[in-house]
Structures are given as structure tokens and as C-alpha cells.
């Protein structure tokens, strides 16, 4: 027993000695932070990365901080290169000189028909890098852009898979629509179909001076998307995977059935009418009777989503390449048969240096989206499920759908047996860019690109077979749309530096043209228990089609 007590006392003393020893080893260091000209760096950040303790430099650039032998001080200031100090270099009266980050000053930003140094920009242009969007648990690039730059407002109207968020740059506009112009590797494209893992850089052109080169179509702003290219340094294979769940988080609160009955009685009595519920009925609701929150019954507890991205990149001094494949699967939060979205992406980016004067780059991209949803309007389903009192069960004791008095529909029945709407689209695009160095600083650039977009919607809305059901129609809808767009441009550019001065000029010509075609047809039948192929044909039919061609010729200069 004495041996056990002695071991316990010894262990306790050792534990007490450890923090005392650590306290004795900590010490105070101090210093001053200056720039290369000797001026104090007021507000410079000093952080001990090992203890997460920090401070900032005062009006004279001075600071002091308690450190331990394992401390590493990270000194930083906006526009300057960070500096790390550790070990024996940590002492009193340190003089720390931060060097200007010339790489930030020389950073190139993608603008209309070219690039410019960030320091030379006069328009409102924001640049979004890969690090700001990668790793986000989103299903499309638009969602990944939320919160990345000021003035870019993205709103998600609903949670349905494949829903298109609205994009507004610096507020709303009343000219045609509010969508900004989106260019992907130089040609107009659909931002919804871009794989977020393929992005190298995004530039957002916000004001008139930065968008003027694109004309009136850029009145709502411009989003320029540049995809990744291969590197000559090494070959890489990259695989990314994300898996998660979506959960309804903000559903309307519906009162319990017995509270509804009590409040309903109170409202009727106050208006001079007899009560609708007896005390026995209220007690029945309170003690195991119906208490069904319809809005909660139409949603799943959680809906999984996943994405997989595989890329191969590499090359040598003359040729670089990047090949990427992507897959995304998002389940709908609504109950029903296999509702959700699947997206498939494929991309090839190839660059080749033919000679010291001539090089070219080609991009080929394909995306397929498949979205399956219920065949009714979502507003109808949510509205009916929200207003239904909890005294009515959504299904009876036999599992049959109920149609309470005053309602001829059942939201869950529409989701599970009311048919479906299937939307499929294919987006194929390709570009070829070439550059010829004519003289020192003088270059001739050309680009040709095209996009083929096909969209098909198939809807099979089925009647809900039940005595009290008001959903008695079967409706079959078929829609198809195709657009083919072609873009070409030729530019002559001149860029020359003389010491600290730079001269830049550009003149160009572009052609854009396209062809759009589509049709829409639908049929409606009644008195059928199944679908459009069986039942009495009604006069409610429709057929329509449309087609158009357009072209734009432009000259531009900067």
C-alpha cells in the first residue's frame, strides 16, 4: 500500500513540475518591423504559430511577445512578403525588414480580350483564384462563387437539384435580363456546366470601363472563366472526392394538432360561432391521435450528394496537356422515385510550342446534365403541405393517401405517384487559339471556337387514382431545343517595356453567330388509371416550334 501511495505522489509531483518547467522556459522577445526604406510598419501582424498567440506592431513598428523554445513567429503585412523567425533568432530588440511583394504588383488579371497587370487596372475588376473555390461542398460553380468578391450577388431560389441560382453584378438591371455575360476560355458558355475542379482563374468585370469592350451585351457585367492547363515541370495524377448530406434546416413550424383544435375553437367562439372540436376530440389529439406535420412528411431526413474528379496533367518544354473527368450526383430532398441530378464532365486542354515564334492551344469540353424531378409545380406541393393542419394524417392506417375535406390533392401522393419530369442536356464546346510573334512585342493572335448545346425535357404527369383526388389528368410533354454558336476573332497586340514604363495596345475584329431551334408538344387524357397512352383523348393538345439565326460583327481596340 505504501508503494502505491509513493508512486501516486511521485507521479503528481512530476505532473506539477511540467507546467512549472514550461513557465520557466518561456521568455519575452521584442523588436521593430520596418520596410525596405526603414519606415515603421504600423499594424504589422506578429503571430506565434505554435501557441496561436499574437500581437500587432504599434505606431513605431515595435512589438513584444511571450515565446517558448518551440515558437515560430509569423510576421505579415498586406502587400509584403511574409517572414518566419524561430529558434535562436528569437531575441530582444530584433529588427525585422519586410520586403515588398512585387509579385502581387505584377500579378496578371484576365480582362476583356487579354490580361493586364493588377497595378495598371482602372476599372472595377475582381479576380477569383482556385484556392477560393476549391474544396467547397457545392454542386456547381455558381454556388462556389458565393462570398468570393464584393458586388457579386448570388441567390439560390430553391433547393431542387439542377436549380439555377441567379447571378447579379452590382444590383439588378431591367434590360432584357439580369444575367451577366459568361465567357469560358474565350467563348460564351453555360456556367452551370463547368466543373469547379477545372477552374484556374475567374475574373469578374463589374463596371462600364471594364465591360465596354464587349458592347451592350455586357451591360450586366462579365464573368471570364479560364480553365487549367498542363505544366511542363512534372506529370501529375489527381483524384478528388467529396461525400456529404443535405438536410432541411428551415421548415415552417406547424402547431400540434391539439393546439390547433384549441385555437380554432377560440377563434370561432370569439366570432360568435360554436366550437368545432369537443373536449374529447382535443384530448384524443393530445393522447396519441393524429399529429401529422405534412411539410415534414414530404422531405427526406437527409439527401446524400457526392462528386468525383480525376485529372491527368503534364508535358515537356514544347507540349503540355490536361485531361480531366468529373462526376457529380445529388439526390433530391423530396421523397419520390430517384429524384436528383447527375452531371458528367470531360475536358482536354492541349498547348504546343511549334517554334520560338509560333504556338497554339486547343480546348475540348463536354458536359452532360440529367435532372429528374416530380411532374408538378413545386410551389403547389409546398403550399398545400404548409397550410394543412396537423389534425389530418397524410396517409391513413392502411397506408392510403388521404384527401381531407376542402382539399382534393395530397402532396406526398403527387411526389410518389404523380409522375416525373426528366431534363437532359448535352454541352459540347471547343476552341483553337494561335499566337504568332511578328516582331519584338508585336503579336498576331487568332481564335476560333464553337458550342453545340442540346436540351430535351420529357414530362409524364400521372393522375392520382383516388375517390377524392382532383388530379385526374395525364399529361405528356416533350420539348427539345438546340443551339449552335460560332465565335472567331483576330487581334494584333503590342506590349513593350522601357525601364519602369510599359506601352500596351490592341486592335481586333470578331464574329459571333448562332442558330437556335426548338419544338414543344403536349397531350392530355382523362379517365385513365395509368398514363397518356391509355384513356380518353381531350382537346387539350398543343404543338409549337421556333427557329432563329443571329450574328454579330465587332471591331474593338484598347
Where are these regions (language model features)?
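Short, small/polar-rich motifs associated with maturation and membrane association
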Residues: 1-347, 359-361, 429, 521, ...
Amino acid at each position: 500500500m505504501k508503494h502505491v501511495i509513493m508512486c501516486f505522489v511521485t507521479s503528481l509531483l512530476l505532473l506539477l513540475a511540467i507546467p512549472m518547467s514550461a513557465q520557466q522556459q518561456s521568455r519575452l522577445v521584442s523588436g521593430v518591423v520596418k520596410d525596405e526604406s526603414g519606415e515603421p510598419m504600423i499594424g504589422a501582424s506578429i503571430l506565434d504559430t505554435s501557441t496561436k498567440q499574437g500581437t500587432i506592431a504599434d505606431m513605431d513598428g515595435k512589438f513584444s511577445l511571450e515565446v517558448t523554445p518551440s515558437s515560430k513567429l509569423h510576421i505579415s503585412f498586406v502587400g509584403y512578403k511574409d517572414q518566419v523567425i524561430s529558434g535562436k533568432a528569437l531575441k530582444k530588440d530584433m529588427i525585422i525588414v519586410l520586403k515588398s511583394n512585387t509579385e502581387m504588383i505584377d500579378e496578371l488579371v484576365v480582362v476583356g480580350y487579354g490580361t493586364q497587370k493588377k497595378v495598371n487596372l482602372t476599372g472595377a475588376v475582381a479576380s477569383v483564384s482556385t484556392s477560393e473555390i476549391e474544396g467547397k461542398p457545392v454542386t456547381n460553380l455558381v454556388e462556389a462563387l458565393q462570398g468570393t468578391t464584393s458586388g457579386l450577388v448570388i441567390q439560390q431560389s430553391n433547393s431542387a437539384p439542377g436549380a439555377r441560382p441567379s447571378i447579379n453584378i452590382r444590383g439588378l438591371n431591367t434590360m432584357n435580363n439580369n444575367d451577366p455575360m459568361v465567357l469560358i476560355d474565350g467563348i460564351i458558355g453555360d456556367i452551370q456546366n463547368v466543373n469547379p475542379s477545372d477552374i484556374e482563374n475567374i475574373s469578374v468585370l463589374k463596371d462600364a470601363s471594364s465591360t465596354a469592350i464587349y458592347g451592350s451585351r455586357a451591360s450586366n457585367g462579365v464573368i471570364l472563366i479560364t480553365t487549367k492547363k498542363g505544366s511542363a515541370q512534372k506529370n501529375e495524377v489527381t483524384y478528388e472526392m467529396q461525400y456529404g448530406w443535405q438536410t432541411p434546416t428551415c421548415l415552417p413550424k406547424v402547431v400540434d394538432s391539439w393546439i390547433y383544435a384549441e385555437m380554432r375553437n377560440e377563434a370561432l367562439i370569439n366570432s360568435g360561432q360554436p366550437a368545432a372540436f369537443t373536449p374529447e376530440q382535443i384530448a384524443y389529439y393530445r393522447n396519441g391521435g393524429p399529429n401529422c406535420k405534412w411539410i415534414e412528411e414530404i422531405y427526406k431526413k437527409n439527401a446524400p450528394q457526392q462528386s468525383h474528379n480525376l485529372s491527368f496533367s503534364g508535358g515537356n518544354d514544347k507540349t503540355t496537356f490536361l485531361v480531366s473527368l468529373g462526376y457529380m450526383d445529388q439526390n433530391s430532398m423530396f421523397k419520390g422515385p430517384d429524384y436528383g441530378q447527375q452531371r458528367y464532365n470531360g475536358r482536354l486542354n492541349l498547348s504546343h510550342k511549334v517554334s520560338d515564334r509560333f504556338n497554339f492551344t486547343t480546348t475540348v469540353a463536354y458536359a452532360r446534365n440529367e435532372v429528374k424531378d416530380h411532374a408538378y409545380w413545386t410551389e403547389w406541393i409546398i403550399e398545400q403541405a404548409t397550410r394543412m393542419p396537423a389534425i389530418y394524417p397524410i396517409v391513413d392506417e392502411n397506408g392510403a393517401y388521404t384527401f381531407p375535406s376542402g382539399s382534393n390533392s395530397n402532396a406526398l401522393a403527387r411526389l410518389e405517384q404523380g409522375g416525373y419530369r426528366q431534363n437532359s442536356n448535352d454541352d459540347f464546346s471547343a476552341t483553337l487559339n494561335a499566337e504568332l510573334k511578328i516582331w519584338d512585342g508585336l503579336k498576331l493572335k487568332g481564335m476560333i471556337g464553337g458550342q453545340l448545346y442540346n436540351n430535351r425535357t420529357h414530362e409524364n404527369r400521372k393522375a392520382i387514382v383516388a375517390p377524392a383526388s382532383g388530379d385526374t389528368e395525364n399529361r405528356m410533354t416533350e420539348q427539345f431545343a438546340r443551339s449552335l454558336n460560332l465565335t472567331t476573332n483576330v487581334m494584333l497586340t503590342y506590349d513593350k517595356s522601357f525601364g519602369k514604363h510599359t506601352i500596351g495596345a490592341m486592335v481586333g475584329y470578331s464574329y459571333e453567330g448562332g442558330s437556335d431551334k426548338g419544338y414543344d408538344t403536349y397531350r392530355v387524357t382523362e379517365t385513365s388509371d395509368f398514363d397518356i397512352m391509355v384513356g380518353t383523348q381531350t382537346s387539350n393538345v398543343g404543338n409549337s416550334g421556333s427557329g432563329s439565326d443571329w450574328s454579330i460583327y465587332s471591331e474593338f481596340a484598347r
